[in-house]
UniProtKB/Swiss-Prot annotation:
Organism field: Chlamydomonas reinhardtii (Chlamydomonas smithii)
Protein name per its UniProtKB record: NADH-ubiquinone oxidoreductase chain 5
Family: Belongs to the complex I subunit 5 family.
Protein's job: Core subunit of the mitochondrial membrane respiratory chain NADH dehydrogenase (Complex I) that is believed to belong to the minimal assembly required for catalysis. Complex I functions in the transfer of electrons from NADH to the respiratory chain. The immediate electron acceptor for the enzyme is believed to be ubiquinone.
InterPro entries hit by this protein: NADHpl_OxRdtase_5_subgr (IPR018393), ND/Mrp_TM (IPR001750), NU5C-like (IPR003945), Proton_antipo_N (IPR001516)
Catalytic activity: a ubiquinone + NADH + 5 H(+)(in) = a ubiquinol + NAD(+) + 4 H(+)(out)
Gene: ND5
Any one of the GO BP annotations: ATP synthesis coupled electron transport
Keywords annotated in UniProt: Electron transport, Membrane, Mitochondrion, Mitochondrion inner membrane, NAD, Respiratory chain, Translocase, Transmembrane, Transmembrane helix, Transport, Ubiquinone
Spans traversing the lipid bilayer: 1-21, 31-51, 52-72, 82-102, 112-132, 135-155, 175-195, 198-218, 237-257, 264-284, 291-310, 321-341, 358-378, 387-407, 440-460, 468-488
Length: 546
């Protein structure tokens, strides 16, 4: 039962990418993909019950010794502890909803079986990463989700923008992944083992901790490595939902929690700058999916700040990761319905007037948006408020600055989320009419999970009771006040040039231009020179001699 949650998504991917899939048709491929994900999710629920409620952590040796090099023996072992159980439940639950949604959303695509196969592989490798008991098996899942993200972002290969975005994502992650690999090799050289138990103390210091931290920054799109995240929206909407909710971008945060890497100063600085930067970018975007993408980047910044606040911060970070998975999946799936109903148009300034014709979509997007901004009695409120409270009580000047930046980010989040919702449904525009996708069950499930009542069912108590530790009245109420201020500001400024900040912010602070002019273009120029002088020259000389 424990292995089903890991291997069944991979099985679904194997079937749908094999020659057998051409005989299954769209219906057969959909049944295979959804069926495998349902089995994986049910297995994850059983694991969650056994580990969380019964306290039965399990370690499963799958293949024995994978390979041996001298005294080093690599084992293929999965460890199902509390952290793994929570992550598997989140990953398989969100992925099952995305698979159901994708079967309907992509029903006109001639290669639906291939798309579903890539989605299943994506989920399967994420489950391998989550359940891995050592760094070597973790790297298999880590590289697997990287390859799958490249295939899915560039799935519409007839679009040049999609191909370039896929290349950008894989190249940026190659830089951070290279440092992660170097750190793993360093650990193997000095310890002779890659087991997590030995790493929890060793990897938290020095070069190893920094290299693993930078590897996590790349996957989780932190500042300097964030440039690929918004461009990844060129892929189909189900891909965006899966990347942002439960798989790729959460892998970095999970790895840091797993290895207990909490370099307080560096992590807090990186997380707070990322959160604020992404908040500014989100407020200056007009593309629906890019606005949601920058909200993901911003929330990942919250999680990174929380990681720098000690062991309690690690727990708060994982709590926010789980709630974020639900409301971000609901946001993207509802956004997909809006986009499909507007003929593929993603420019929110051209939306509006569809509140009556798309009531279900409007309500779903509203609940998910309120959870994103941290409205009371929704799941996002509890997880975000916990992080803000931890930053407020931390006796460190850097934490005080981070707390201020997170508060400003909360205001920006409220502003651009209100702008998005208002432009989609409240502005009169006769050309907008959303046609709901037939399969609304996945979105409904994600929206229900955002309600506090469902959290009480799962946890067994009111989460608010665990948050009532003493804090000054102003500290507790300031986030809510800033959230309301952001909503009012956005409502007053929608449709006005005042809401469009300076062009510098709209161009994302010039990071793309900076990277293009400094490391990227010179490398491309060098490649063209070596091709012209070396490859083409040698080949032409060889042909003449022949």
């Amino acid at each position: 039962m424990f292995l089903l949650s890991v291997f069944f998504p991979l099985l679904g991917g194997l079937v749908n990418t094999s020659p057998i899939a051409r005989f299954l048709g769209h219906r057969g491929s959909s049944i295979i993909a959804i069926g495998c994900m349902v089995v994986a999710f049910i297995s994850s629920v059983v694991i969650y019950y056994e580990v969380v409620f019964m306290g039965c952590a399990v370690s499963v040796d799958v293949f024995g010794t994978w390979f041996s090099v001298g005294t080093f023996h690599a084992g293929w072992t999965f460890n199902f502890d509390l952290l793994t159980a929570n992550m598997l439940f989140t990953v398989t639950g969100v992925s099952m909803a995305v698979h159901m949604y994708a079967c309907d959303y992509m029903r006109q695509d001639p290669h639906l079986n291939l798309f579903l196969g890539y989605l299943s592989y994506f989920t399967g490798f994420m489950c391998v990463l989550v359940a891995a008991d050592n760094l070597l098996v973790m790297l298999v899942g880590w590289e697997g989700i990287g390859v799958c993200s490249y295939l899915l972002i560039g799935y519409w290969s007839h679009r040049l923008s999609a191909v370039k975005s896929a290349q950008k994502a894989i190249l940026v992650n190659r830089v951070s992944d290279g440092l992660l690999m170097w750190g793993v090799l360093w650990v193997w050289y000095h310890l002779g083992s890659l087991e997590y138990d030995l790493l929890n103390v060793y990897s938290a210091s020095g070069f190893v901790g920094l290299s693993i931290l930078i590897g996590a920054m790349g996957k989780s799109a932190q500042i300097l490595f964030h440039v690929w995240l918004a461009d990844a929206m060129e892929g189909p909407t189900p891909v965006s939902a899966l990347i942002h909710a439960a798989t790729l971008v959460t892998a970095g945060v999970y790895l840091l929690v797993r290895l207990h890497i909490h370099d307080e100063m560096f992590v807090i600085i990186v997380g707070s700058l990322t959160a604020f930067m992404a908040g500014v970018f989100g407020a200056t975007q007009s593309d629906l999916k890019r606005v949601i993408a920058y909200s993901t980047c911003s929330q990942l910044g919250y999680m990174m700040v929380s990681l720098g606040l000690g062991e309690t911060g690690g727990e708060a970070s994982m709590g926010h990761l789980m709630t974020h998975a639900s409301f971000k999946a609901a946001l993207f799936l509802a956004a997909g319905m809006v986009i499909s109903g507007n003929g593929g148009n993603q420019h929110i300034a051209r939306y509006g007037g569809s509140a009556h014709s798309a009531m279900f979509t409007m309500l779903t997007l509203m609940v998910a948006s309120l959870s994103l901004i941290g409205w009371p009695e929704l799941s996002g409120f509890y997880s975000k408020e916990t992080i803000l409270n931890l930053a407020a009580i931390c006796a460190d000047p850097i934490a005080d600055v981070a707390h201020t930046l997170l508060l400003l980010t909360a205001m920006l989040t409220s502003a651009y989320t209100t702008k998005l919702f208002y432009q989609c449904f409240m502005v009169d525009f006769s050309g907008s009419s959303v046609t709901p996708v037939r399969n609304v069950l996945p979105i409904l499930a994600m929206a229900i999970l955002l309600l506090d009542i469902m959290l009480k069912v799962w946890v067994g108590t009111n989460l608010l009771s665990g948050m009532l530790f003493f804090l000054p009245w102003g500290v507790k109420t300031l986030p809510f006040g800033l959230m309301v201020a952001g909503i009012l500001t956005a409502t007053a400024a929608v449709g006005s040039e005042r809401f469009t900040l300076i062009r510098f912010c709209g161009s994302r602070w010039g990071f793309d231009q900076l990277f293009a002019r400094s490391p990227v273009n010179p490398i491309f120029d060098l490649g063209r020179i070596t091709w012209a002088i070396g490859d083409r020259g040698l080949l032409s000389v060889g042909n003449l001699r022949a």
